[in-house]
Amino acid sequence: MSCLPDWLAAGCRDGDAASHPTIRLRFRTATVHYLAEFDVVVVGAGHSGCEAALAAARLGCRTLLVTMNLDTIAWQPCNPAVGGPAKSQLVHEVDALGGEMAKITDRTYLQKRVLNSSRGPAVWALRAQTDKREYARELKQVLEATPNLTLRQGQITDIHLGPHDEICGVGTFFDVHFACRAVILTTGTFLGGRIWIGRKSMSAGRAGEFAAEGLTATLERLGFETGRLKTGTPARVDRRTVDFGVMEVQPPDPELRWFSFDPRAWVEREQLNCYLTRTTAATHQVIRDHLHLSPMYSGDIEARGPRYCPSIEDKIVRFADKESHQIFIEPEGRDTPELYVQGFSTSLPETVQIAMLRTLPGLEACAVLRPAYAVEYDYLPATQCYATLMTKRVEGLFCAGQINGTTGYEEAAAQGIVAGINAARLVRGEALVILPREGSYIGTLIDDLVTKEIREPYRMLTSRSEYRLVLRSDNADRRLTPLGREIGLVDDERWGLYQKKIAAITCERQRLETTRLNARDLPVHLAAKPGSITLADLLRRPGLHYGDLESLNQGVLLDAQVREGVEIEVKYSGYIERQNEQIERVSAQHARVIPADLDYERLSTLSKESREKLNRIRPRTIGQAGRIGGVNPADVSALLVYLELAQAGRLTPAAP
């Protein structure tokens, strides 16, 4: 059965599914020949595009994944690593919904470490150094083996609209056209990409690959606002020319942890070391002497770069009083001599880069295999999207990843799976899914993107979530796997494993809350006062862990994930309950829906700036309205009063 509109599907049933319908190419009509019919077309095969394509195909949609180079699918062009603060939570959540990133990482890691382990569980962050070639190869194999999914090399330049401004197809640079109901744009840094080394530049999405030309003009003709952003990547050096003996070893953690909640994806393997060195006074002097050659400081690049991943020249300028900066030396794979110089991103000329690198302890004789460079690219401010990631202007057009203004593989994957789910649901005539910000980091990420006017690359941080104590890595499956199951991305075996885990956590929590120990049976340092104490109250004491219960012969044999989940839920139960109560209180007010056709210009109680912002962004709820820059608490209160009066029938929606 065709999922295309009747007027288009009728023309796609002849012969080899080719058709010659007349479609609208914005301001003009044209007759095109559709080579094939799909339900969903995904443009770009980076981390966002891969998750989007897999989600749509697994939900039964005939999906086409179009990439400019089939050999660089799921490539990690910058740091070959997954996870880190806030990013690991995103990876766990993608996995909980039924995505792929966590599984691939658990098969291709070179090293794993838990960051912030000395702090509370809300900010624990698993990080993996990955083998970039193995990662790309493994994920490509998954894509190629997925039913309903077709991979094709090409460059999409045209988006075809039907009579009601709905998606009906796409066209390539070489005039090959595909009919479809939904399009997901995951263009990364390729959209109008230009790379810079010193004062010289060339058109490229990344080093050695063409930029995507033509699509930006199409989007602008469709009425979308576009902008420019910038990012960069450091040089790669030859490990055979590096002296690791003068560096600080960064070994993997002794206890192996996993990104995926599915044990079927876990692969134990030998891990490698990373290394730490630091910049020196000589490094800083070389940079200062050549700062005028940086395209960022000469004015050649005007696009904004990522605030939380600055270039080394930015660090030297912004933190002029700092004597040294950490630089991590990380392997890119098991079968390559290339090392990634983390923290040393730059766009200075290549000869200057070599001089800079050779001032670092251990790199005095290093050979550069690939120079660092900056890349600027086009993006669409995501306030033009709903929280479903479908654009407000064109039904069936979704955006995910760097085109929405984000930076990072994890942020891209998180948006990709949401866009893929919703594109499939649109095609199937089902309600689209919105993840609330209080329920996940993915929800927080998307809410920020579609609400706030972002003019620099957005990176997920734990501080961006008001509810990080309940949005932990360990409970991502408890928060999102039921939704993944309902949507259709969690299979029976995975669901069975999830239910078994939940039952084990519930059972052990009940045991800890009901089992009491007499103070006489406890070591002196634990017997605080006479009487008895539950195991749960004992576990809540500072410095005590589940392992201490085992030393008292009061533990039971539990899976590591279950044990950690139980300990966190018990130990922080008071804080968690208070945050859940806060979420309920805030959600009741913030979830209040604003009429889609409300004319803010007629609400004289709102400030002028507020009316302009609200009319442009069109927030869905009171909570979203309050997070828009320029909308202050007084404006939110006035809006609430208006809605209350309108609901009570004391004024008409058309008159304030």
From Swiss-Prot:
Keywords: Cytoplasm, FAD, Flavoprotein, NAD, tRNA processing. GO terms for biological process: tRNA methylation; tRNA wobble uridine modification. Disulfide bonds: none annotated. Its cofactor is FAD. Coiled coil: none annotated. It is found in: Cytoplasm. Pfam families: GIDA, GIDA_C_1st, SAM_GIDA_C. One of its GO terms (cellular component) is cytoplasm. GO terms for molecular function: flavin adenine dinucleotide binding. FAD binds at G44, A45, G46, H47, S48, G49. SUPFAM superfamilies: FAD/NAD(P)-binding domain (SSF51905). The keyword Nuclease does not apply. Its main location: cytoplasm. Gene3D superfamilies: FAD/NAD(P)-binding domain, GidA associated domain, C-terminal subdomain, tRNA uridine 5-carboxymethylaminomethyl modification enzyme MnmG/GidA. NAD(+) binds at residues 305-319. NCBIfam families: mnmG_gidA. NAD-binding protein involved in the addition of a carboxymethylaminomethyl (cmnm) group at the wobble position (U34) of certain tRNAs, forming tRNA-cmnm(5)s(2)U34. Homodimer. Heterotetramer of two MnmE and two MnmG subunits. Belongs to the MnmG family. HAMAP family: MnmG_GidA. This is tRNA uridine 5-carboxymethylaminomethyl modification enzyme MnmG. The lineage of its organism: Bacteria, Bacillati, Cyanobacteriota, Cyanophyceae, Gloeobacterales.
